[in-house]
Structure formats: C-alpha cells, structure tokens
Amino acid sequence: MARHTKMKKIILSLILFTCLSASAGAITVYTYNITKQYPIVDAEIDTVRPIASITKLMTALVLLESGIDLNEKVPYKGMFYSHSKFTREELLNLMLVKSDNRAAEALAESMGGKLWTVYQMNKRAIMLQMYDTKFDDVSGLSAKNISTAKDLVIMLTDAYKHDKIRDISALSRYDLKVVDKKNREKHIQVNNTNVKLMNKYDIIEVSKTGTTNAAGKCLVMIVHKNGEQYAIVILGGTTRADVDNLAKNIMEKII
C-alpha cells in the first residue's frame, strides 16, 4: 500500500503543477480515506488558513444539534423578498446549497443570536478536538474563521452523520417557494455553488464551497467510490476552475 500511495502522491504532484502553476501561494490539498482511516495525498495540511463559507457546515451542525424547530418561520433579510419569513429548513437549504450569508445570519439570530451561535461553534470544535480551528462569524465572511485540512476532515465526518446535511449539501439545485407582498406565490431555483462537479459526478455525498479574498477558492467534499468513503479538502485555490480541475483529477485518478 505504501508503494501505491507513493505513486498517487507523484501523480498528485504532477496534477498540482499542471493545474495550479499560476498560484501565488501554497495550496492546501488533503485526500483522506475515511473507510480505512489513512491519508492518500496531502499538501500543507497543517497550515492554518481562512476557510470562508466552509464555516457554514459548523453553523449547520450547531443548528441541528440544538434540536430547534426547523419548521418555524423566522425573519430573513436577504435577496429573496427582503423582510420576509422562511422556515429554518428553507434557510438551511439556502445556506448549504447557495451559500447564502444572510440565511446563515438569520438562522443564528433565531437560535440565540450570532454571538451565542459562534460560541457554540467554537465549543463544538473543541469537543471534536479541532484545536487549530476558530470561528469568528456564522457565514465565513471573516478572515478570522480559520482551520486546517486535518480539522476540516473531522468536521466533514461529523457533518456526514446528519441526514439533513447529507441530503441538502448534495443537492445540485434547490427550489424555493416565495410569496410576495401581493400574496402571489413564486418558485425560485438556486444552483449549488458546486453544481458543475455535482452534475458530472454522482459519487459526491457532502459538498461545500467557500470563497473570500483571504481564503481563496475552497472546496470540501465527502465522496463514495468503489465501496469506500473519502474526504477531499482543497483550500487557497486561485480560481474556481483550478480547484474544480484538481478535484476532478483526484476523483478520477487518485482515489
């Protein structure tokens, strides 16, 4: 297995050079076999860096672990009919599929406020032994939301345990029903921020992207291939195309 793993690392190095030669800084790449519990390929996996909207997976974990009513409607001040109300489950879909920052904030406010939610997120990170992880807000906009690839694999596997997160984050698109001020019902379809890969690969079970200037282009996934489960973490990419190409090569040639 060691020889096989070494060959995969060589292949990944070539892929990294080809796909990311224009990157200004080092990129984090981690592919971990969850089923057999061993790393396959790694690069900069202990580097602490901003994680952008990958943060929202922890926001979702805190929401679901709280046991709060997902069918209750709460205020939402986002792009879909500002000052309207949606159920927490609808907002959870918007947060994980579209990566809607206002949905994350609305969920936090409805639980106990943003400060309380961030406190619970950090508390859960410590409980999961994610000691290099720190959350500063619920959406990931803050550059102070930081983690490592190793920690994010822990968070991914914890998120996978929740049916809601698996079902929602694996949706390529979500249909939201909205009612305007004249009581007219409309349906708005939003695409998953990882829709290109999800449309091509049916092995993706959990998925979340993230993008900020500080974090670069980020992607975390759990995929299932040939009877085994893998975590894929890519942080600090220069372009979404680079990250997508790297993820494609990992899914097709590495695992």
Residue spans for each PLM region:
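Active-site-proximal loop and beta-strand segments within enzyme catalytic domains
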Residues: 51, 64-94, 98-116, 127
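Positively charged n-region of N-terminal signal peptides that target proteins for export
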Residues: 2-10
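Acidic/histidine-rich, surface-exposed loop or edge segments in extracytoplasmic proteins
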Residues: 38-45, 100-105
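Penicillin-recognizing serine hydrolase domain
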Residues: 25-28, 32-34, 39, 91, ...
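Active-site SXXK
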Residues: 36-37, 48-74, 152
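A glycine-rich, coil/turn loop motif that links secondary-structure elements
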Residues: 45-50, 80-84, 138-146
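Bacterial Sec-dependent signal peptides at the C-terminal "C-region" and cleavage site
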Residues: 18-26
